[in-house]
Swiss-Prot record:
GO terms for biological process: DNA-templated transcription elongation; regulation of DNA-templated transcription elongation. The lineage of its organism: Bacteria, Pseudomonadati, Pseudomonadota, Betaproteobacteria, Burkholderiales. Belongs to the GreA/GreB family. The gene is greA. This is Transcription elongation factor GreA. It holds the Pfam family GreA_GreB.
Length: 158
């Protein structure tokens, strides 16, 4: 099994979701199934069908999270010593050379990505273009919307 890079915060978020699913969601759906069963005929019982479908989703998500956590390589960006090189977990201040606008991104795992929060997936075109670059370098990003160039202004390990 290959390892999946994830930040410390990302691992904590997955553990919190797993805990919630196991302690709140799973028992609630078991109760919903029991209540629906008590209504009698299961062949045309929409509440039962919905609860069983929800149970399948919850169990599938639990297995998915457990699998991800088992394969996770937790990386604490604050503990990185990459000598100014852009690596997974780094926070990067960039200047969009087309618009002149500054932008800041942190490179995170696929499950953690949230563009509105400035967190980009390690597998995104921009992250792939940035990995290995240093402050002052220019990265050319080839994306579906066309090519964009970014100058690396600062690399931080927060």
């Amino acid at each position: 099994m290959s390892t999946i890079p994830i930040t410390k915060r990302g691992a904590e978020m997955l553990k919190d979701e797993l805990q919630r699913l196991k302690t709140k969601e799973r028992p609630a759906v078991v109760n919903a199934i029991a209540e629906a069963r008590a209504q009698g005929d299961l062949s045309e019982n929409a509440d039962y069908d919905a609860a069983k479908e929800r149970q399948g989703f919850i169990e599938g998500r639990i297995l998915e999270i457990e699998s991800k956590l088992a394969a996770a390589q937790v990386i604490d960006p604050a503990g990185l010593d990459a000598d100014g090189r852009i690596v997974f977990g780094a926070t990067i201040d960039l200047e969009d050379l087309d618009s002149g606008k500054p932008v800041t991104y942190q490179i995170v795992g696929d499950d953690e990505a949230d563009l509105d929060s400035g967190k980009i997936s390690i597998s995104s075109p921009i992250a792939r273009a940035l990995i290995g670059k240093y402050e002052g370098d220019v990265a050319t990003v080839v994306a579906p919307g066309g090519e964009r160039e970014y100058e690396v202004r600062a690399v931080k390990y927060l």
